[in-house]
Each structure stands twice: as structure tokens, then as C-alpha cells.
Amino acid sequence: MQFSVKTSKPESLSTPCLVIGVFEDKNLPELTEQLDKAGGKIIHKLVTAGDINGKIGEHLLLQKVEGVRAQRLLLIGCGKSSELDAKKYCSILTHTWKALQKYTLTEVTLALPTLAVKDIGIERKAELLARLFVTNEYHYSATLSKKSKHFQLKEACLLLTEGRERSAANKGLEIGAAIGKGMNTARELGNLPANICTPTYLGKQALELATKNKLLSAKVLTEAQMKRLGMHSL
């Protein structure tokens, strides 16, 4: 999955799907409000009618909204704006991934990192998004004879309204994606059967990882070396 950042007016952005938030307390996030004005207040009408209440776990897909260039708008419930903290933000991202799984999309643009979340800025919000998306993408298949199809997103783009936040957002995405990949590697090793994931196999994986990154080094000890070091659990 590739991550990127764009700075644009939400109504002017051409994308297969634009993911935006809706609060439970009837107040629309600033970017959603801006988009709603361009779309003839369609989101406000849907919220008023009760088609979406804004609770975390809810979503609603709109297609080809007049005045908006995005092919689809995916409205995501974000709960009460006054209670939005990092934990709830992560829950929103998880539900967003589940909602995206229902549609045949390979590319999305997300405005969720523009939400005001207690005590965290754009870098941390971007990091959490990248980490959660990468880890949600993981599926074990190494020893399965029948490979099941699963949702794969090729590109996730963050939409920002402030150009000065681009650098921090990119940094957050890079960190989050790296953490997510590391978590997936650990999960894969844990899921492999013991006759494959042997100490020798783990040693080879560690050495291979070290060759790919100049900041890492690895040394595999023999049984005799471990014994001399007093590692008596052999």
C-alpha cells in the first residue's frame, strides 16, 4: 500500500472515493462542512433525516454528489466531537477500513486526519492511520493450500487543507507504515508452524533484515557461544 498527501479544496479533488467524518452532535467537521456547501447541503439533509447519526461504527456511501468532483463520498461516524481522543480516533480508522472492504476500491482519499483529536497533532494522526491500515491489510497465507481473496488497497491519500502540515503528515505516514510492517512481520513469524519457523529460520530472517537496513546489525550465536554466555535455557 502506498501513502501520500495532497493539499486541495475538498470539492475540487478528483478521487474514486473521499472519506469524511460526521459527528454525532449534528455539528459537521470543518472540512465536511466546506464540502457540504459545495454539494448543496446534501450531508446536512441526510444527518437531519437520520440516515446517518454520526455514531462511531456508522457509515454511508454517496455516489456522484453534484458540485463535488469525487466519484464517491464515504461518510464515517465519528461520535461526539467533544469526546474525540486518540483511542476513539483509532476506532474510527478501524471502522473506516471495515467500511472500505465492502466496496471494490483500490484508491481512497481520507480527510479524517483533519479532525480535531485531543492531545495529538497531524503527525501522530497520520502515523496512526498508516499503522492501522497496514496491520489491517495483513492476512496469513504462507502454508494455506487455498489462498483466499481479501481486500487490498493500493493507495491511501491524506487530504489536508493546510500546506504547512504536509511535512509532518508525510513523516507520520512513513513512521506508521514502518511500524505496521514490523508488526505484520512479527505476526507472520508467530503464525508460521514450528517446523518452519525454527531458530535457524529466525536467524536467517534477522540477518536478511539487517542487510536491508544500514541502521540495523545482527549476529546469530551458535549453541556453544550461548552456553559460554551462561544462557542455560538451551
Regions found by a protein language model. Give the residues of each.
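Short amphipathic alpha-helical segment within the helicase RecA-like ATPase core
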Residues: 1-234
